[in-house]
């Protein structure tokens, strides 16, 4: 539903970047892309039972290229890089040559922790869980807990900051439940 709202508001992500009128439109673009990523991940975990169209994830990846630069990654806590890198781990053939998506996720996660909005950490943990890399998930959860203690959440963006903590808590609970 969020991805469809993105399409209605700003058009289908793809080859052309929209002309963003303001920061809010950039935020909508990113949140809609995250929704596309989450839909693709959920469908993979459900053995494709949901029926998310195969083109949603690659379109979201191409759409995020509009904001995946140094300026926008700093401004948006590493989220553009995190979204693209996350998609590179699940969509075959979209990773740029010579790029390690996991190393890019590390960079994005650090930006998010530095800026007090840890959505890149949550995305990294989700795709790591999807990749069955439970050690990486546990490390991200620990790193997140330490970061929350050392760097205050960004007051201007409390909702996404809180959502990232909620996602990581849910993953932590899932790991605990699976192992008890």
Where are these regions (language model features)?
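Amphipathic alpha-helical repeat scaffolds of TPR domains
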Residues: 18-47, 74-90, 117-127, 166-170
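A cross-kingdom marker for long, charged
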Residues: 105-180
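Alpha-solenoid helical-repeat scaffolds
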Residues: 48-53, 70-73
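Flexible, glycine-rich surface segments
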Residues: 60-126
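Short helix-capping/linker segments at secondary-structure and domain boundaries
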Residues: 44, 93-96, 133
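Flexible helix-coil transition and linker loops at the boundaries of alpha-helical arrays
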Residues: 1-29, 64-75, 110-114, 150-158
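Helix-turn-helix repeat elements of alpha-solenoid scaffolds
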Residues: 1-15, 51-63, 95-102, 138-142
């Amino acid at each position: 539903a969020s991805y469809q709202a993105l399409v209605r508001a700003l058009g289908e992500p793809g080859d052309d970047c929209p002309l963003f009128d303001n920061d809010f439109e950039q935020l909508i673009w990113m949140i809609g892309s995250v929704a596309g990523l989450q839909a693709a991940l959920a469908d993979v975990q459900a053995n494709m039972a949901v029926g998310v169209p195969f083109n949603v994830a690659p379109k979201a990846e191409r759409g995020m290229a509009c904001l995946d630069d140094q300026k926008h990654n700093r401004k948006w806590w590493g989220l553009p890089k995190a979204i693209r890198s996350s998609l590179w781990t699940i969509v075959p053939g979209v990773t740029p040559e010579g790029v390690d998506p996991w190393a890019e996720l590390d960079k994005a996660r650090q930006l998010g922790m530095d800026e007090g909005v840890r959505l890149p950490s949550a995305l990294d943990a989700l795709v790591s869980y999807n990749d069955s890399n439970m050690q990486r998930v546990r490390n991200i959860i620990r790193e997140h807990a330490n970061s929350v203690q050392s760097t205050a959440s960004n007051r201007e963006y409390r909702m996404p900051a809180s959502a990232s903590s909620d996602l990581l808590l849910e993953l932590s609970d899932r790991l605990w439940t699976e192992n008890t």
